[in-house]
């Protein structure tokens, strides 16, 4: 059977790539697009790593597996819990490949930590495979266990780069460390594919989107994409191999930062409590300043290992309180709504939820800056999500205008600002490209859903499509290709849950949960 090699390009968009394709910067990608079927994709809302990598691999929307962003907000229980791979209640396309006797390898795809038992191999990656806010994980991130030692010995493999990129003024060794990491992802994926004779291989370049966030189309991102282009050429030359390029979402240059919880407070939907941030912030004591000093002194690892996490969490972030500390800053008895970043908004059912929702949605539709409305859509949760976990969905979901970054920090004081740390923000418009023996070269297709990828890739491997997958099989096969529906299979064990605090800290350092 022809092998399929899927390259997951976190945050890739044709908006970023088209100029480089046209000016000759990415010659292999340009040539590949001429001989393939390709499309712009539409991600599930919100267009973020969590949940969209699982949307790709499961063919389902978040209402089917119960994760809507990096955190789960439960105002009844007064908790905010950070998600990891064990929280996604779903089987994935490689489970169906295994069920049909085909082997698969998944390298560095977010949402896969703790590593699941997939036949043949899983190498979990960023951002969820972590040991602490400023420390990479050294072991326990592979299936089978022990493979992590082999990768370290043979490839000097790392899950996260060191030093970690944390700002757009860091263009030296932090960027070089990411480029080295991307190179090793490809080396490991190709080696495992060949040595283990894998029939399906998926490798994700998560830190590619970290470069997008901090630099957009500047030189660090361009260097990374030139590296990707070189590997695209190598993979395209492999015999009997389908090559698929895809992304979990797209990206666009940031124009506006919108502090949604600050806006909710201003509009009367949220009431506040005084916190330690209110004392330390006026003194200039924030996490960004202290990290900069620690990096300069070369003591980041020492401080991360010696200062207890609970003490680290007391140091405020410049943008305001995040994660569970958001609820410490909120008087829930007088609060009607609390937001996560990048789209989800949760309502307090101690109030009249439908009345609050109607009023809040109307107000959100009117929010604007100098460039117009901030949101292209404001939806009820049930309009966006379906499935057994839809009752846990946020009551409201906003779709951000390209370039708008919705920040969930509480207590920073500002509502709408110019971009701060991030030069680019996520958008729902990602990429898909399929080339190789099993695919017809149909050129540009109409916009497709990210949910279409899993059923299409199963059909490429002569597998039937489970009835609980929402996507459609793309018209990129010859007329002789046939398939049927099949019953879904049940989910096996997914491993022990990782400490959600550690996951949150890594996301926070990268700017995902600022």
Question: Model segments located where?
Answer:
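His/Asp/Glu-rich, glycine-adjacent segments
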Residues: 61-215, 285-318, 332-372
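Acidic/histidine-rich catalytic neighborhood
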Residues: 233, 237-243, 249-349, 480-488
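Short, structured active-site-proximal loop/turn typified by the sulfatase FGly-forming signature C/S-X-P-X-R
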Residues: 18-60, 105
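Short catalytic/ligand-binding loop motif for oxyanion handling, primarily in non-cytosolic enzymes
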Residues: 14-16, 49-50, 64-65, 112-119, ...
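Active-site neighborhoods of enzymes that stabilize oxyanions during catalysis
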Residues: 97, 288-444, 448-454
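Active-site-proximal N-terminal segment of extracellular/periplasmic enzymes that hydrolyze or transfer
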Residues: 1-37, 469, 506, 513
């Amino acid at each position: 059977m022809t092998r399929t090699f899927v390259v997951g390009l976190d945050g890739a968009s044709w908006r970023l790539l088209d100029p480089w394709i046209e000016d000759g910067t990415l010659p292999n990608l340009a040539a590949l697009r001429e001989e393939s079927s390709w499309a712009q994709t539409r991600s599930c809302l919100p267009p973020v790593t969590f949940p969209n990598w699982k949307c790709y691999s499961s063919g389902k929307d978040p209402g089917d597996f119960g994760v809507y962003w990096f955190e789960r907000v439960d105002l009844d229980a007064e908790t905010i819990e950070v998600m990891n791979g064990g929280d996604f209640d779903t089987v994935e396309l490689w489970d169906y490949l295994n069920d049909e006797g085909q082997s698969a390898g998944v390298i560095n795809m977010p949402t896969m930590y703790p590593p699941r038992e997939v036949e043949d191999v899983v190498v979990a990656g960023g951002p969820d495979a972590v040991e602490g806010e400023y420390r990479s994980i050294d072991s326990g991130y592979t299936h089978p266990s022990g493979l992590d030692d082999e990768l370290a010995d043979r490839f000097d493999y790392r899950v996260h780069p060191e030093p970690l990129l944390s700002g757009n003024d860091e263009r030296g060794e932090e960027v070089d460390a990411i480029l080295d990491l991307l190179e090793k992802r490809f080396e490991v994926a190709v080696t495992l594919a060949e040595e283990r004779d894998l029939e399906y291989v998926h490798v994700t370049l998560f830190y590619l989107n970290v470069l997008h966030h901090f630099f957009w189309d500047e030189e660090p991102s361009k260097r990374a994409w030139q590296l990707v282009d070189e590997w695209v050429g190598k993979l395209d030359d492999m015999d009997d191999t389908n090559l698929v390029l895809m992304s979990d979402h797209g990206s666009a240059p940031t124009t506006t930062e919108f502090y949604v919880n600050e806006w909710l407070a201003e509009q009367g939907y949220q009431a506040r409590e005084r916190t330690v941030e209110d004392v330390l912030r006026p003194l200039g004591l924030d996490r960004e300043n202290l990290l900069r000093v620690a990096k300069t002194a070369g003591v980041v690892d020492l401080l991360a290992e010696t200062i207890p996490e609970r003490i680290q969490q007391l140091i405020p972030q410049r943008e305001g309180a995040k994660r569970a500390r958001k609820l410490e800053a909120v008087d829930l008895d007088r609060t009607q709504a609390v937001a996560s970043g990048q789209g989800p908004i949760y309502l307090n059912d101690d109030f009249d939820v439908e009345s609050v929702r109607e009023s809040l949605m109307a107000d959100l539709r009117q929010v604007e800056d100098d460039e117009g409305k901030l949101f292209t859509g404001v939806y009820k949760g049930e309009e966006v999500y379906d499935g057994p976990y839809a009752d846990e969905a946020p009551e409201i979901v906003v779709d951000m205008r390209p370039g708008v970054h919705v920040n969930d920090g509480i207590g920073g004081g500002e509502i709408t600002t110019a971009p701060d740390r991030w030069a680019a923000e996520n958008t729902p418009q990602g990429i898909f490209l399929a080339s190789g023996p099993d695919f017809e070269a149909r050129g540009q297709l109409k916009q497709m859903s990210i949910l279409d990828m899993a059923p299409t890739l199963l059909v490429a491997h002569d597998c039937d499509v489970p009835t609980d997958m929402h996507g459609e099989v793309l018209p990129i096969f010859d007329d002789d290709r046939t398939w049927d529906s099949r019953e879904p299979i049940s989910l096996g064990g997914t491993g022990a849950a990782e400490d959600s605090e550690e996951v949150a800290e890594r996301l926070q350092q990268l700017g995902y949960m600022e």
